[in-house]
Amino acid sequence: MDFPIPQKTGPQKIALEARGLSCIRDDRVLFKGLDFTLKNNQVLLLEGKNGCGKTSLLRIICGFREQDAGELLWCNTAIKGSNYYAEMAYVGHLDGVKKELSVLENLKMSLALSQAGKYTIDQALDKVQLAGYDDSLVQSLSAGQKRRLSLARLLITKKTLWVLDEPFTSIDKQGIKLIESLMHEHISNGGMIILTSHHDLVLHEADVQKINLSACH
C-alpha cells in the first residue's frame, strides 16, 4: 500500500527536541549525546539491535524514567514545565487496557481523562474493526483485538504525539494495513509519531526520520 505525500495541515510550530540525551543501565551506556528534532507531520523511527536502548528511550520520552544527561524540550520549553504530557499518548507492549472492564468502559475511562479527539467511540470502534464489541470484556479478546482497542483509544482522544512501542506486534496483515493507514492519517493532520518497529514502514520517506541507537554509544 502506497500513501500519497501528506498535505501539511493541523497545528504548526510544534516540536519535540532532544539535546544530548544519555541513558545508562546497570553501568552500561545504552546511548549518549543523542540529538533529534521532531515536528508536525513527521515520524521518528527508532532502530537498532535488541538491548540498544530503544524501549529505554521511549520510557524517557514518556516520562517513565529520567535521562542520565541531556534534556527534552516541547515547544522550546522543558517538558516538565509544559503541557507536553497532555499532548502525548503511549501504546506499549501491554496495550494499557483494563482486562476486567468492557471495551466500552475502557474507552469511556480514556475519554474522561483526555480532551476528545475527532472520532466518537462508535466511530473509533468501527475504524479499528471492533464494532459490536462494546460490551465484551477485554479479557475475552484476542491479543490482536486488544491491540486494536489500544488504537481506538488513540482515535477518541486529542493527542499530538503518539509514542508506539512495536505497534505491529500480535497484528495480522489486515491489522498492519490498518495501523499504517491510521499513522498516515495522524501525520497528515499535523500529528507526530515516535515508534520502534521491525516492520518496514509504508509511509512517504521524506516524513520519516530514522535513528539507529546501536550507533549512539
Region spans (language model):
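Catalytic Walker B motif of ABC-type/P-loop ATPase nucleotide-binding domains
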Residues: 162-166
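Conserved ABC ATPase "signature" region
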Residues: 118-134
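Conserved ABC transporter NBD signature motif
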Residues: 67-86
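Conserved ABC ATPase signature
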Residues: 137-143
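Helix-to-loop junction immediately C-terminal to a conserved catalytic motif
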Residues: 62
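Hydrophobic anchor residue at the start of the ABC signature
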Residues: 151, 190
